[in-house]
């Protein structure tokens, strides 16, 4: 059993610390940091990086994850210059944790069936708990609260 959670960010939000180690910031999304809890229970992690806009090639990365608080992440050896500072500039948000990945395997994902997409503007309201903006009940599985 493994967690599967979507993550996206500006180019470089997943940092290469060395040949076998990656790190990325974990922000408050749904308010409960579910991904962090899931990784603490089961540290196996699988990631796929897809280039939808130019080559449509992907990269699979599988390994084990450790959850670090921001101070632990800042003390890592081989930290790329500005890594933690750059993470703070993403929409004015600060990471709640960092995920450190020990890479066990990585391989290319063929571009044959990956669609080529075009970029569209999308307004994002960071840090909101408004269900309409988050889309948290998109499939209507949670009963609507009674109207007053």
Language-model-detected regions and their locations in the chain:
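Binding-site signature for planar aromatic cofactors or substrates
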Residues: 1-148
């Amino acid at each position: 059993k493994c967690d599967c959670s979507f993550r996206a960010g500006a180019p470089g939000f997943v940092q290469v610390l060395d040949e076998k180690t990656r790190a990325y910031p974990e922000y408050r999304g749904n308010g409960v940091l579910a991904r962090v809890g899931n990784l603490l229970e089961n540290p196996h992690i699988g990631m796929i990086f897809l280039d939808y806009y130019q080559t449509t090639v992907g990269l699979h990365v599988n390994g084990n994850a450790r959850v670090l608080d921001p101070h632990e992440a800042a003390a890592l050896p081989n930290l790329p210059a500005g890594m933690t500072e750059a993470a703070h500039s993403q929409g004015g948000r600060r990471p709640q944790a960092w995920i450190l990945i020990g890479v066990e395997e990585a391989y290319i994902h063929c571009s044959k069936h990956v669609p080529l997409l075009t970029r569209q503007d999308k307004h994002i309201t960071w840090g909101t708990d408004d269900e309409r903006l988050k889309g948290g009940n998109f499939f209507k599985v949670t009963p609507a609260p009674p109207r007053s």
